[in-house]
Structures are given as C-alpha cells and as structure tokens.
C-alpha cells in the first residue's frame, strides 16, 4: 500500500510518556522497530505509520490533519484548544493540575490570586479557571521548571502538574486548589484517512486497557455448590464450567475485577471451592 494512504499515529518522541505509549502499542500487537532517534516507523502487518513528535505538538498536528491519531496527555489536548477528540482513555499517566502557592502565603482560594503573577505551562487552562472565579492574573508562560519560579521572584503562585506532591514539599509549596485531573489519551481527528484501520487500532488497545482491570480466576467446586459459587463470580455472560473426572465436582473459569479477586477467593472457600488460582490477563476481547 502507498505509504501516503497509511494511517498516521503521532507518538511522543521521548520521555516517560514515550515509553508508556510504545509499550502499550506492543502489548496490543502493534509491533514496530524504531531506529535510534528516528522520526518514523512502520507497524508490522497493518497500514500504520508512526511519527515521533513533541508530546505537546501532537494535539495541534492531529487537529490540523497532519496525523490521524495520537497519544498524548488530556491536559495538553485541553490546553491546545484544537478540534481533535478523545477516542479512548488509556488509563495511565494520571496526574492533577493544581494551583500551588508558598506554604506561608496568605492565599486561601483562586479568587485571592486576582492581580498576582502566576507561572505555568498551561496558560489557557489557567486563564479559563481564574475567569470562573472572577480573578485575573499576570500569566508567565513557561515550558518547564515552573516550581522554582516563586523562589526566583518571577511569580506569586504556579499552576503545574502534581503526581505525588514530593516536589512541592521540597520547594515548600502547598496546593491551593486543584483545577482538574488528567491522563494519557488516544485522540483522533474527523478527517481520518483510514477509519477502518483506526477502529482496529482502538479495538486492540481496548483489549490491553480492559485486561489491566481483570484477572482470570479458576477453581474447583462441588456441583452441589456451583450455584452459590456462580453468585460470587458471575462473569460476563456466564462462567465457563467443565465437568471433572469425579462427576460430583466441576471446574470453573471466570474473569473477575482485580480489586475483587481476594474477596472472591475468600468467599469461594466458604462454599467449598478448592484449588483457587488467579492468573493475570494481558489482553482480552469483551
């Protein structure tokens, strides 16, 4: 197929999000080989071309039609104000965007920032948020190292992404207000050159993302207790049940939410189940 007709997917060229995106694609069977610092790569077995870009450029390039899809942060998508839409949430790279001020600052809400200086890499989001709180500030737009701007005398407050809060503590800062929560997303524009392949990509990625939330639970149970066991682990349509050599017993295989596995195992024991085994799932179709 002519490479000009290939589905183009933009991926972060470096950093933690680059590793996350690359691993996710490979887990979904979208294997590729990128040359050192290469900007392009082909996906094996599919008419898909990967283009490695600056993460914050991906929303704009997708909206403009230079790429059909892209993996980026929902924070960057919102900041760009472009027309690309979220095709699916990938469940990784979660973080919070927050207004942060010095520990000893006499500031108690966003409204108190009226007339103050705020350093941020997200001026558009910050401006909209302040407007909702009847505040207007002088925004200092930066591309990084925002957390030191207060100490340098550049700003009275910052708006930055927060994960654990350890960086804030190290710089004697506290969260004044959280603006929103964000995560890594797959985006797509409305002029996608190959919607059929785009749908296949989405379906493959969904298989990986959904599988993260489930485990396969297998156990043996007396046939007389099968109904009680099925009530504990109902599965999606119904559990897979097989008869064992002893007709009084059967084996059951069922998908269970990972967060509910331990509780389910304990409850299964109370109804007589044995040989209860949890197996992680790397991919699935539901």
What are these regions (language model features)?
Residues 47-66:
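Short, structured active-site "lid" loops
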Residues 60, 96-100:
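Signature of uroporphyrinogen-III synthase
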Residues 2-48, 72-85, 89-92, 96, ...:
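Small-molecule-sensing regulatory modules
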